[in-house]
Amino acid sequence: MTANVSGIGSVLQQMQAMAAQASGGVASPAAALAGSGAATAGTFASAMKASLDKISGDQQRALGEAQAFEVGAANVSLNDVMVDMQKANIGFQFGLQVRNKLVSAYNDIMQMSV
């Protein structure tokens, strides 16, 4: 249960960093991600890869926990499974929206005349 609370705290910290960046409080996205521990290098590619790896890891962990619950493991409770599944879903939806924004920005740039 303590891991879930610290996980929620981590997600909250990332959301606050993104909100600060959106309002102009943080100079760059790399600085916002570095504060949350998501990216160690300052490049966009490394930040994107770290985010995708985290999303994939969350999904794999949630799936493993769900399978453990299904076979009746004593140390896995239903509420932990549900919370981890929702965290994985939210992470995936966030990644999907980031991808959509990147594609939209790319299309806008491609339509600009030089």
Curated annotation (Swiss-Prot):
Tree of life domain: Bacteria
Residue ranges of coiled coil: none
Gene Ontology biological-process entries: bacterial-type flagellum-dependent cell motility
Localization in the cell: Bacterial flagellum basal body
A GO-annotated cellular component: bacterial-type flagellum basal body
GO molecular function (one): structural molecule activity
Entry keywords, A to Z: Bacterial flagellum
Annotated Pfam families: FliE
Chief place where the protein resides: other
Family named by the database record: Belongs to the FliE family.
PANTHER family with a match to the protein in the record: FLAGELLAR HOOK-BASAL BODY COMPLEX PROTEIN FLIE, PTHR34653
Name of this protein: Flagellar hook-basal body complex protein FliE
